[in-house]
């Protein structure tokens, strides 16, 4: 249904693809993977005819509708969340809008002489609107918006009041309501919580069209895709199966290619040695010439291009006291809304707590209380003896200084550290080479998050409070962060929508419920078994 055949594309001197082919047919769910900047979003823009290929052919099945979700959602205002979702839902919303115009036209006495033509057109549009499920559109829109985390009261409020992340959800709802023949989803999980991600998984698994998706959420890809297409170094390679299977296949292919390379190098060395030894002897001239021709015809096997995965050995944090954080009798309100009433919590040294709860349950509020970013209305929240706190929150990124580069930011924080050490730190967090000269004001959200985490972990605290630390991080950076934190000798309290991250790092779970706190002695994997759900609010 969607095909790229022998496509080449470059941005300036940088070659993204060379003679690359890719296909997605109805019923296929394709995960598009590769390092940042490899050209994943460019593939979507080529399919949508927003960019042109330098060579080859991009084709979409005739009359097929394509829904494209990108991170650029545009302006939203002047209508309710529900109206904004419906108005951008493609052909069905266009048909609904035309029906309303036709109804007004037919009721206009000044257009009585056009009534027959208007009635005929109304019948055609109404039939198409019905065929597209238009009469159930509002009900479907409410269902999709609820699945994406919108409370009923918010659905009928002004979309202009929403934050950027919630507007992203509205944009995603629009695309899902289109019921297109093909879906292109570029990082759809970036602004979703676990409950919404799980709902989206169910929705996409039942989608019957062609799906091409990018995501840094490993678990999400594993549950959805039937094929992985990797873009790396100008090459586009397809693998059957989910993300885990792709990694296994890729590793096996690399091992086989390395073995073939080694065998060929040994053979070439042997042949070259023979030629060098006998090239001056007339009695061996025919054999030497034969072997020279043989070498000329051999297609040289290259070593596989391995992605540079940079590791960084973080220092051991100072030891804290055994009691790291204590909340006693804590009450917290926002206006008339009570978030906590008489809450008690003790966090002890080297425990790794992840906090679960539906939207609005107070996960971020709990982390702010523990970190001292806000005060309780009643009760106490105190840190224990010798606790050195590291608090990562989304607003942390606003504290970077405009005009300073990545390297200067690290140097300002650690003036006595060597240049080599700081550049190694920057590279480990996704700023290799000249990227350290990027100024803070031009960094993306993900780059800012990586820089804040680099600053925090270089001189590590012994108590990490992390509010969505993996937002916008690519898989390689997440893997590096997980490996670093697996060996972290301190205490952790975290909120994350990344289930792979939670599984790897947590050993205690705190669930916020309307009836108070529920605690689980095992990590996230044990919580799923014990609670019977992957997240609160999921049956």
Q: Which role fits each region the language model picked out?
A:
Residues 1-261, 308, 314-539:
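ABC ATP-binding cassette signature C-motif
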Residues 249-304:
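Intracellular alpha-helical coupling/juxtamembrane segments of multi-pass membrane proteins
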């Amino acid at each position: 249904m969607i095909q790229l055949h022998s496509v080449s594309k470059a941005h300036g001197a940088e070659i993204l693809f060379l003679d690359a082919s890719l296909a997605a047919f109805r019923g296929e769910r394709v995960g598009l993977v590769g390092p940042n900047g490899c050209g994943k979003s460019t593939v979507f823009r080529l399919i949508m005819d927003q960019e042109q290929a330098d060579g080859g052919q991009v084709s979409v099945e005739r009359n097929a509708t394509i829904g494209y979700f990108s991170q650029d959602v545009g302006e939203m205002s002047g209508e309710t969340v529900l109206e904004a979702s419906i108005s951008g839902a493609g052909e069905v919303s266009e048909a609904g809008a035309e029906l309303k115009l036709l109804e007004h036209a037919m009721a206009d006495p000044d257009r009585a002489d056009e009534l027959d033509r208007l009635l005929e057109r109304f019948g055609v549009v109404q039939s198409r609107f019905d065929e597209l499920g238009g009469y159930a559109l509002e009900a479907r829109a409410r269902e999709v918006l609820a699945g994406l985390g919108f409370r009923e009261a918010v659905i009928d409020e002004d979309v202009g009041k929403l934050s950027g992340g919630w507007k992203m959800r509205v944009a995603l709802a629009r695309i899902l309501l289109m019921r297109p023949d093909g879906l292109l989803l570029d990082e759809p999980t970036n602004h979703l919580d676990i409950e919404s991600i799980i709902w989206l998984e169910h929705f996409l698994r039942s989608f019957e069209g062609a799906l091409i998706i990018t995501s840094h959420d490993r678990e999400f890809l594993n549950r959805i895709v039937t094929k992985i297409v990797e873009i790396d170094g100008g090459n586009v390679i397809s693998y059957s199966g989910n993300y885990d299977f792709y990694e296994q296949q890729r590793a096996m292919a690399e091992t086989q290619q390395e073995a073939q390379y080694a065998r060929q190098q040994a053979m070439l060395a042997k042949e070259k040695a023979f030629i060098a030894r006998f090239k001056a002897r007339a009695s061996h001239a025919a054999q030497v010439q034969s072997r020279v021709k043989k070498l000329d015809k051999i297609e040289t096997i290259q070593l596989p291009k391995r992605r540079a995965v940079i590791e960084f050995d973080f220092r051991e944090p100072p030891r804290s006291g055994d009691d790291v954080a204590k909340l006693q009798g804590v009450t917290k309100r926002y206006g008339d809304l009570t978030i906590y009433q008489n809450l008690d919590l003790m966090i002890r040294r080297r425990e790794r707590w992840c906090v679960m709860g539906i939207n609005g349950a107070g996960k971020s509020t709990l982390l702010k209380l523990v970190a001292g970013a806000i005060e309780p209305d009643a009760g106490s929240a105190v840190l224990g003896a010798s606790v050195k706190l590291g608090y990562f929150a989304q607003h942390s990124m606003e504290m970077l200084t405009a005009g300073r580069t990545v390297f200067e930011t690290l140097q300002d924080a650690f003036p006595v550290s060597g240049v080599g050490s700081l550049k190694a730190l920057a590279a480990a967090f996704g700023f290799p080479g000249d990227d350290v000269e990027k100024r803070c004001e031009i960094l993306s959200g993900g780059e800012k998050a990586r820089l804040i985490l680099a600053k925090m972990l270089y001189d590590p605290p012994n108590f990490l409070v992390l509010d969505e630390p993996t937002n916008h991080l690519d898989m390689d950076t997440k893997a590096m962060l997980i490996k670093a934190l697996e060996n972290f000798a301190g205490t952790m309290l975290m909120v994350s929508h990344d289930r792979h991250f939670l599984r790897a790092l947590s050993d205690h779970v705190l669930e916020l419920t309307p009836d108070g706190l529920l605690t689980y002695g095992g990590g996230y994997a044990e919580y799923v078994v014990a609670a019977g759900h992957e997240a609160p609010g999921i049956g």
